[in-house]
From Swiss-Prot:
One of its GO terms (molecular function) is GTP binding. Residues 227-229 form a propeptide. Belongs to the small GTPase superfamily. Di-Ras family. A lipid is attached at residue 226 (S-geranylgeranyl cysteine). Keywords: Cell membrane, GTP-binding, Lipoprotein, Membrane, Methylation, Nucleotide-binding, Prenylation. The modification Cysteine methyl ester is found at residue 226. It comes from Homo sapiens (Human). Expressed in normal ovarian and breast epithelial cells but not in ovarian and breast cancers. GO terms for biological process: genomic imprinting; regulation of cyclin-dependent protein serine/threonine kinase activity; small GTPase-mediated signal transduction. This is GTP-binding protein Di-Ras3.
Length: 229
């Protein structure tokens, strides 16, 4: 009877431990590894695929329907050779209607992803105001914060923005550049891996046109062995 009672308590304890957040478990077993917050801000006009991109990255599922977004934050705990990161990715809608919120998000951001749709030229043009806002807020420390210009929907044949157009814009803004497809999962995971290992340089290499089965050369050089936990 006593053994049965003990077994029941042990099972309850194990069940509770399984429900503990990964963060608490890591702190219990790896107290020597400091967990750092890393905030990535994703911005773009309505319909460019920001929410779909993040949903694809977080769950591996493609979201077909469009859901208007003001601001959402996705959280993920990552472990890599540099330590343990608490990754916070904020999906922020560009535009003048929520400029105060944008300023707050930019001030706290460690990295920025500027997303446009290759099927609509105006979505690239409208990113300029947000890029200038980042420059204004970060000021002389701008070089410390990686910025990646991302052309989404690269799988769509009806494009208005050529690969070279996006690359040229990235050169002008001195930021990294890559094209992705959230729908076909091209370069989605590589994008966020690159951000975690990206080091800002005075000059930025351009992405070479790549095959679907290959990752960009810039990403390959920056990609570290990170484990999603």
């Amino acid at each position: 009877m006593g053994n049965a009672s003990f077994g029941s308590k042990e099972q309850k304890l194990l069940k509770r431990l399984r429900l503990l957040p990964a963060l608490l478990i890591l702190r219990a077993f790896k107290p020597h590894r400091k967990i750092r917050d890393y905030r990535v801000v994703v911005v773009g006009t309505a319909g460019v695929g920001k929410s779909t991109l993040l949903h694809k990255w977080a769950s591996g599922n493609f979201r077909h329907e469009y859901l208007p977004t003001i601001e959402n934050t996705y959280c993920q705990l990552l472990g890599c050779s540099h330590g343990v990161l608490s990754l916070h990715i904020t999906d922020s809608k560009s535009g003048d209607g929520n400029r105060a919120l944008q300023r707050h998000v930019i001030a706290r951001g460690h990295a920025f992803v500027l997303v446009y749709s290759v099927t609509k030229k105006e979505t690239l043009e409208e990113l300029k105001a947000f890029y200038e806002l980042i420059c204004k807020i970060k000021g002389n420390n701008l070089h410390k914060f990686p910025i990646v210009l991302v052309g989404n929907k690269s799988d769509d044949t009806h494009r208005e923005v050529a690969l070279n157009d996006g690359a040229t814009c990235a050169m002008e803004w001195n930021c990294a550049f890559m094209e992705i497809s959230a729908k076909t999962d091209v370069n989605v995971q590589e994008l966020f891996h690159m951000l975690l290992n990206y080091k800002k340089k005075p000059t930025t290499g351009l992405q070479e046109p790549e095959k679907k089965s290959q990752m960009p050369n810039t990403t390959e050089k920056l990609l570290d062995k990170c484990i999603i936990m």
